[in-house]
């Protein structure tokens, strides 16, 4: 009789554990996207979520450090909660980051995506969210990256150097600008008639908008599986 009760206890324990695992797998990883400008990469993430490319996570918050950023309109159209955090109003980098942390914690955010976020985050911040912050950079790191390399300047440098191939990289963020572990890269060939502007648009379309959603899904899926 005791053996029967023992088997029953084991059976119930297995059922409970499986139920916990199913609930964990069903729960989406909560994503925050930090922006500063037009939000084209944010839109790529929203589109990917709508198409089911990003299925392990959900964009739950958009934070901008620029009050007039069009990315905020994109968030509004997609019914995603948003907030504006202005460093000049808070007075210091520390206060600026504390406010961002407050918003992230309030929304129970799991991972952070920097999508054209034009502000360097401190070592304290990046360590707090170690392996939880993703950034997309418009070159094949380690080329044309680090301090001073952002936006159109990256593509100007690639053309000035005369390289034949460029691309984009998604990487984890640490205290070194563009120095974190690489998650995914995609190459784009440079044309003879390219200008910085045409190259920027093609790198966005052929690389950034492809590998950023794919990387976000990869990280979310891995986080859910833990």
Name each region found by the language model.
Residues 3-226:
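One-carbon transfer enzymes
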């Amino acid at each position: 009789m005791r053996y029967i009760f023992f088997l029953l206890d084991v059976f119930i324990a297995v059922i409970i554990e499986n139920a916990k695992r199913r609930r964990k797998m069903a729960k989406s990883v909560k994503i925050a996207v930090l922006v500063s400008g037009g939000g084209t990469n944010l839109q790529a993430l929203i589109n990917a979520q709508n198409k089911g490319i990003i299925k392990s996570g959900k964009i739950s918050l958009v934070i901008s450090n620029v009050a007039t950023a069009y990315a905020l309109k994109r968030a509004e159209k997609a019914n995603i909660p948003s907030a504006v955090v202005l460093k000049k109003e808070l007075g210091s980098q520390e206060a600026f980051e504390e406010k961002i942390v407050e918003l992230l914690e309030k929304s129970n955010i799991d991972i952070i995506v920097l999508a054209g976020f034009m502000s360097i985050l401190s070592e304290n911040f990046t360590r707090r969210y170690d392996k939880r912050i993703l950034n997309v950079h418009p070159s094949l790191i380690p080329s044309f990256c680090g301090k001073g390399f952002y936006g159109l300047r990256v593509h100007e440098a690639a053309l000035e150097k005369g390289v034949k191939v460029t691309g984009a990289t998604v990487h984890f963020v640490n205290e070194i600008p563009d120095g974190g572990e690489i998650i995914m890269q995609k190459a784009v060939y440079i044309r003879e008639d390219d200008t910085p502007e045409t190259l920027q648009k093609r790198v966005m379309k052929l690389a950034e908008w492809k590998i950023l959603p794919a990387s976000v899904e990869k990280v979310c899926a891995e986080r859910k599986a833990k």
